[in-house]
């Protein structure tokens, strides 16, 4: 692969993607062979949300990892200041680094 991203470059992309998702500006973002997708389910005011990390492999997007979180807030931008968001961004970055340089089939 021609793209050789550093961990700090990937983390910056992940952080900007999460912030833009929480602002409601985007639902997905792609960097090289990695895609971050966002979806949510609003059931009785309880928001169950998922950020999914996918890789381009064998001509289609394959799921790598799901990051689940819940909120009683309909406004995700209010969540960006929550302390656990930084941990989630770090976790997504770590997973992205596993796949961005070495696409591979998952074991499930």
Which stretches of residues belong to each language-model region?
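Short acidic DE-rich linear segments
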Residues: 2-3, 101-108
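N-terminal export/targeting and maturation segments
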Residues: 6-13, 89, 93-97, 101
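Positively charged, low-complexity intrinsically disordered regions
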Residues: 12, 16, 55-56, 64, ...
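Enrichment for repetitive, rod-forming helical segments
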Residues: 18, 84, 91, 102-105
